[in-house]
Structure formats: C-alpha cells, structure tokens
Amino acid sequence: MDYFTLFGLPARYALDRELLATRYQELQRQFHPDRFANQPEREKTLALQQATTINTGYQTLKHPLKRAEYMLSQQGFDLSNEQHTMQDTAFLMQQLELREELDAIEHSSDTEAVLSGFSSRLNKMIKTRREQMEQQLDAAEWLIAADTVRKLRFLDKLQQQVEQLEERLLGDF
C-alpha cells in the first residue's frame, strides 16, 4: 500500500498537512505497539511493522522534498541513492557562484546584513523551484520534475549551510 492510500489522501503533491497529521495520530493510536502487548508474538510483530510504516510514511509525506522524491519513486525514478550528473551547466555555475558568495559572507564587514540578503534570495529561488516542481508533478511531467528535485537538493544543501553559518555567527555574539 502506498503512503497516500495509507493516510487516505489523494496521490498528488499538494496535500492538507493538518489532515495528514490527524490521520497520522489516528493510525498511531490504532497500531501503537502497547495496544498489542498481550497479543501473540505474530500480532505484536505485525503491529510494530505497521507502526514503522506509518511513521516512515508520515515523515515522507510531511516533508515537501521527500514527498516529491516518493512520488517520483512511484513512477520508477529512484532518486534516493542516485549519482546522476547534473547536465544543466548554467545551474551548476550558479551553484558555484552562490557557494563562493556564501564563503565570502563570513569574512564581510557587515556579515548579518549580507547573510540576511543572501538568505532572502536563496529562499526565493527555493520557493520558485518548489512551485515549478508542484506544477510538474501535478502535470505528471516526471522527467522534468526529477530534474527539478535534483536542483532543489542543491538549494536545500545550500540553505542548510546558511543556517549553520547563522548558528555560528549567533554563537560569536
């Protein structure tokens, strides 16, 4: 059973996060291992497996990038361990420039303001790519959506580096 069916949700990228959380809690209560403590071992094992599936499904559908990767995996695209070479040289150049810019921010005289501006630009790029990805997934443009997901991975890693730099800078004050 796929995760969308498990949670009683339509198999599309946009989803009702509150409904997902509600269904998750309902399923957690229904299959919590404590409810099966006095059952035979087979029942306990099945309940534990179901609880694990519920947790994994919830974490997958809850996070936008994981949800997109899951949807693509349902269509035969395995992006989880992929070593796909990015073919978009303009995008790769942009990534190199952004990483160089981020490295330079740490040594700038007005680090906080420059980092804030950089972070704002990066968030806009991520938002644009997520909107593209949503449209592509909804239109079943799987190949294009897979490429967009790959690009979002780069941007997400860069965003994590921004957050790490922010934490280091806050620690310096």
UniProtKB/Swiss-Prot annotation:
InterPro entries in the cross-refs: DnaJ_domain, HscB, HscB_C_sf, HscB_oligo_C, J_dom_sf
One GO CC term, this protein: iron-sulfur cluster transfer complex
GO MF annotation terms: ATPase activator activity; protein-folding chaperone binding
Domain J per the UniProt entry, residue ranges: 2-74
Keywords: Chaperone
SMART domains, per the entry: DnaJ
Alphabetical GO biological process terms: [2Fe-2S] cluster assembly; protein complex oligomerization; protein folding
Subunit structure: Interacts with HscA and stimulates its ATPase activity. Interacts with IscU.
HAMAP family for the chain: HscB (MF_00682)
Function description: Co-chaperone involved in the maturation of iron-sulfur cluster-containing proteins. Seems to help targeting proteins to be folded toward HscA.
The family this protein is said to belong to: Belongs to the HscB family.
Record's protein name: Co-chaperone protein HscB
Organism per entry: Xenorhabdus nematophila (strain ATCC 19061 / DSM 3370 / CCUG 14189 / LMG 1036 / NCIMB 9965 / AN6)
